[in-house]
Amino acid sequence: MNKKSYLRRVRLPRTPADWLEAVMNFIFFLCGMLAVCCVVLISVYMVVSGVPAIHKIGLFKFLFGTKWASTAAEPLFGILPFILSSVYGTLGATILGVPIGLLTAVFLSKAADPKLRTVVVTAIELLSGIPSVVFGLLGMQVLVPAVAKAFGKASGACLLSAIVVLSIMILPSIVSVSVTALNAVPPEYEQGSLALGATDTETWFKISIPAAKSGIAAGVVLGIGRAIGEAMAVMMVAGNSPNMPDSLFRSVTLLTTAIAKEMSYAGGLQRQALFSIALVLFAFIMLINVVLNVVLKGGNRDE
């Protein structure tokens, strides 16, 4: 390609409007690169800070050890209880929150009166804006005593309380994304089903929800990401003991709460181990994002 043909393809700015366009494009490029740089820097920092402790402790002992005693004379750094507590807590919140969120989304999208829909949508939006510490405070003052009284336990600060709080916190993500997905279903699908004699309920569950499955799945994955990354609210209701989660009523520590609980006074290998926990948590979040992208791409191919 000679110089003249290149200049014809890439027009140099000549007018003030051209210069403004070039400047704005450069600003857009910088903003995009800033986001990329943030992700890269965080990833590098997590790896650099987290790998040394794993190297000293041993990968198998770190990931599959069942004892965490970071301040003992002979410290132990097994995070399997934290991993399982996070997995069980997230799974329980998903099992509890997804049906409620999905049914709420179907109601808002298909059945609700416009005035009632406005009220419910406003409430859900407010729910999404409530700080985590408020959820934790309400859980600590209301839910924890209720669990202890209902099940005859000395303390209600346990895995079950964490699951209930997390299930409430993930509702806005599931509901909002699912409503958008259900509203995007072509009305011809539902009209055809109704014309064949199906009831409204049959149409919603056999036509609308399957047609919106990729969007609903995206909402569920976003809710899972919110649940596994939550720290403050969970720390206030879970009990924060490094136990294996062999019961819903066990006091447990999650990956996030382990970091939040000990980082303020940690030093030496203990501090490095907390960064290693953060690296494991970061890997979980990255995996969830990959799953979300796969789900969205799969939905686009189906469409």
Where are these regions (language model features)?
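Interhelical loop and adjacent transmembrane-helix boundary motif
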Residues: 234-282
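Transmembrane alpha-helix signature in integral membrane proteins
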Residues: 79-107
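Amphipathic cytosolic juxtamembrane alpha-helices at the membrane-cytosol interface
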Residues: 21, 100, 113-118, 186-187, ...
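Generic hydrophobic transmembrane alpha-helix motif, especially the helices
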Residues: 125-170
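Transmembrane alpha-helical segments of polytopic membrane transport and secretion proteins
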Residues: 1-31, 292-303
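Transmembrane alpha-helices
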Residues: 177-178, 200-236
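Cytoplasmic-entry segments and transmembrane alpha-helices of multi-pass inner-membrane transporters
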Residues: 100-139, 303
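C-terminal transmembrane helix and the adjacent membrane-cytosol boundary/short C-terminal tail
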Residues: 179-183, 187, 194, 261-303
